[in-house]
């Protein structure tokens, strides 16, 4: 009996399920789906693995580069498809692989000192809760370099003011992470938590209704906050780059320590 040759689009959902079983984050799963859809413009996902060739994969990469996306985006798309092909090889669907594509070296931006002065200025005492909360969030992002998904998932019980530490329950690696708080940040959180109140399992940075902030709500909150302070750039991830720059350049910090603080699995990720 002739063995069936599966179509790429048929196998992709199986790959995603296998990755979910391994415990990859929901954001990673979303990236798989988003990149797979985008790659569909450059590779016929209805073709079978028997029809897929080295030349077809090379044509996909050429088409990607000609589409006008950045070199790093090409690398990101290729990285996802390479992971997919690696799983397919292990499952016996194909013998093909995709070569590793190096990102082009780029200088990561960060908030300027002038922008930081504007962003870190404490709001007036009669400001509303949202503005005050956003000021605390900005302070936390600059002092910790944590990801947006991480800060949204911090609960009141995760903050130990006595030990000056905070636990990250939601990380890209899926592992709990305990990071230190500087004295100034601990003081800011102490005041904020006294005003915020709530149960231990409540989210630290909540909406006015005490609920967890969505990804979009956090992004919009920071955008509104930054614009009100006269700062046009509103990227949350830019705070992460700013923290890294401050730690390494301004404070002469150790790259290996920075790797742990940022939750990177390799030092190469920290360098980028």
Functional labels for PLM-detected ranges:
Residues 1-272:
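Conserved catalytic core of the tyrosine transesterase superfamily
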């Amino acid at each position: 009996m002739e063995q069936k040759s599966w179509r790429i689009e048929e196998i992709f959902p199986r790959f995603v399920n296998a990755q979910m079983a391994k415990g990859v984050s929901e954001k990673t799963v979303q990236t798989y789906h988003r990149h797979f859809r985008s790659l569909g413009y450059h590779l016929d996902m209805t073709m079978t693995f028997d029809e897929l060739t080295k030349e077809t994969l090379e044509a996909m990469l050429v088409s990607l580069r000609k589409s006008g996306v950045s070199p790093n985006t090409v690398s990101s798309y290729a990285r996802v498809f390479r992971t997919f092909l690696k799983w397919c090889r292990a499952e016996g669907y194909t013998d093909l692989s995709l070569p590793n594509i190096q990102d082009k070296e780029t200088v990561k931006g960060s908030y300027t000192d002038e922008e930081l002065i504007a962003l870190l200025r404490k709001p007036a005492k009669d400001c509303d809760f949202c503005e005050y909360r956003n000021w605390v969030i900005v302070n936390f992002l600059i002092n910790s370099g944590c990801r947006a998904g991480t800060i949204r998932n911090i609960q009141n019980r995760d903050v130990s003011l006595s030990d000056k530490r905070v636990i990250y329950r939601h990380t890209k690696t899926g592992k709990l992470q305990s990071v230190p708080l500087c004295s100034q940040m601990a003081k800011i959180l102490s005041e904020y938590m006294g005003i915020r109140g709530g149960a231990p399992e409540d989210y630290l940075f909540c909406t006015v209704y005490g609920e967890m902030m969505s990804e979009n709500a956090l992004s919009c909150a920071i955008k509104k906050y930054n614009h009100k302070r006269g700062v046009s750039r509103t990227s949350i991830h830019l705070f992460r780059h700013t923290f890294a720059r401050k730690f390494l350049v301004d404070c002469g910090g150790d790259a290996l320590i920075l790797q742990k603080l940022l939750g990177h699995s390799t030092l190469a990720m920290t360098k980028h």
